[in-house]
Amino acid sequence: LAGVNKNLGRKPQGNDRAQVGGVIAGECDLAIANTYYFGKMFTGNGGKNPEQIEWAKGVNVIFPNQEGRGAHINISGIGLLKHSPNKPNAIRLMEWLASDMAQYMYANENFEFPVKNGVPSSPLVTKYLSGGKFKGDSVPLATIAEYSKIASELVAEVGFGR
């Protein structure tokens, strides 16, 4: 982590798309970003950021650990509060969101990987981000969470990004 910190091309700033913009501007050679932003960039973010189409075309996405454990995948989740006033409808919504149709729609609109096995990623993600090949890390989030405190301590110890 200390070595990565020393090699930063610029102080961390902005959102994921700003990191790609930094590569395009020549401020750094490599950036870390969530891949679903590439889907938004390839589509110009619904016409709001047409310049980002060229940004997305100007970089290559590299997934780490494809020969080993695979790359971490962020997920979107849903939960039901204990004191929710309308539990039956909340459960119906949760069941629908876990359905193949909803997972497919979400993946195609938001460019995230579906959380349900067997539901395909959006064609854009498959074509541009993984070349049709992607191996996700299967480490449970609870296991990752066990290391959250020590990870935060290491970031503080090396003064990451300062």
Indicate residue ranges for each PLM-predicted region.
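Soluble non-cytosolic domains of exported or imported proteins
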Residues: 13-17, 32, 83-88, 100, ...
